[in-house]
A protein has these predicted regions:
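Catalytic core of PPM/PP2C metal-dependent serine/threonine phosphatase domains
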Residues: 26-49, 105-175, 249-260, 264-269
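Residue-level marker for buried hydrophobic side chains located in beta-strands
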Residues: 93, 164, 209-211
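Single conserved hydrophobic/aromatic residue that forms the stacking wall/gate
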Residues: 1-8, 12
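PP2C/PPM family metal-dependent serine/threonine protein phosphatase catalytic domain
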Residues: 57-79, 129, 133-141, 168-200, ...
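Active-site-proximal, acidic helix/loop segment immediately C-terminal to a metal-coordinating Asp/Glu
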Residues: 97-121, 179-180, 184-185, 190-192, ...
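Short hydrophobic/glycine-rich mini-motifs in sensory/regulatory modules
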Residues: 6-7, 60-62, 87-91, 205-208, ...
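Short beta-strand-to-coil "C-cap" segments at the C-terminal boundary of structured domains/repeats
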Residues: 56-58, 267-273
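Regulatory cytosolic signal-relay segments
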Residues: 18-77, 169
């Protein structure tokens, strides 16, 4: 929109078009009616005096996140979690820094934060892993590394892409049945390349995806799968699922005398409405 400036001369300046929440909602309904689609409230983008409204179809699914953790010693954990939704997908990342304490926390948080930024920029998981590998290798002359565990779920189709580099097995709960997924591979930052593994699965409303650090699996995967099936049958929220897993794993670790950082990150899909 062009408006006359307050100056005495006949000079005009550009002003961004502004929309209120009710106006944006009304626009979404009207454009959706024309397109015969249910649309989200549009994003308002302004650049060089031009305002653009970006409409997108409402996703079929929505993601609900939850996480819980316990440090092996003190209050510093080497595990780091990132959970967020991009315009079309739900993203969940868990990185486990080598060892425990502050050095592990630095590596874990660096890997998770950098991976999240790359994914938000549209970088594929495999390429993001290679870039994180280089970053960790150059961080210091001392050996450092972190596992990289991520899942990306398309909220329109339910297609889930999993990528693991050195990470502990994760879990999927589909149709009420839980199963472990993932094999052994090297963490990022250890070698010149990344020996990661990727997999594609299909999820739907009511399903869970769970990423855990190796400290949670001190007694194996069987009890985790059983607990997840019980939690799914009860319809527990992701935050409660994660809390139960961590508390149970912590008690088991204390009995065995092998404490480690313990973390669980949980994603549940629900109908988008």
């Amino acid at each position: 929109t062009l408006m006359r400036s307050s100056a005495a001369s006949d000079v005009y300046k550009r002003q961004r078009t502004r929309f209120g929440p009710q106006e944006l909602a009304a626009l979404a309904r009207e454009v959706g009616r024309i397109c015969r689609r249910t649309l989200e409230t549009p994003q308002v983008l302004s650049c060089k005096g031009m305002t653009t409204l970006l409409f997108s179809e409402r996703p079929v699914l929505r993601a609900v996140f939850g996480m819980a953790g316990a440090a092996a010693r003190g209050s510093i954990s080497g595990d780091a979690v990132q959970q967020f939704c991009s315009p079309t997908a739900a993203q969940m990342i868990l990185c486990d820094g080598m060892g425990t304490g502050r050095p592990a926390a630095v590596d874990g948080n660096l890997a998770a934060e950098l991976t999240a930024r790359l994914l938000k920029a549209g970088i594929p998981a495999e390429l993001a892993a290679r870039l994180v590998n280089v970053a960790l290798a150059l961080k210091s002359e001392e050996e450092s590394g972190a596992t990289l565990d991520l899942i990306s779920v398309d909220l329109y189709t339910g297609t889930a892409r999993l990528f693991k580099a050195g990470a502990a097995p994760g879990f999927l709960v589909h149709g009420g049945r839980a199963r472990a997924v993932g094999d052994v591979s090297l963490p990022v930052g250890i070698l010149g390349g990344v020996n990661g593994q990727s997999r594609v699965v299909h999820l739907c409303a009511g399903d869970y995806a769970v990423l855990v650090s190796d400290g949670l699996l001190v007694d194996g995967t069987a009890w985790v799968a059983k607990q997840l099936e019980l939690s799914a049958a009860a319809g527990e929220a992701p935050a409660q699922v994660a809390k139960t897993l961590v508390e149970t794993a912590r008690a088991r670790a204390l009995r065995t005398g092998r404490p480690d950082d313990i973390t669980a990150a949980v994603l549940r899909l629900e109908n988008g409405g």
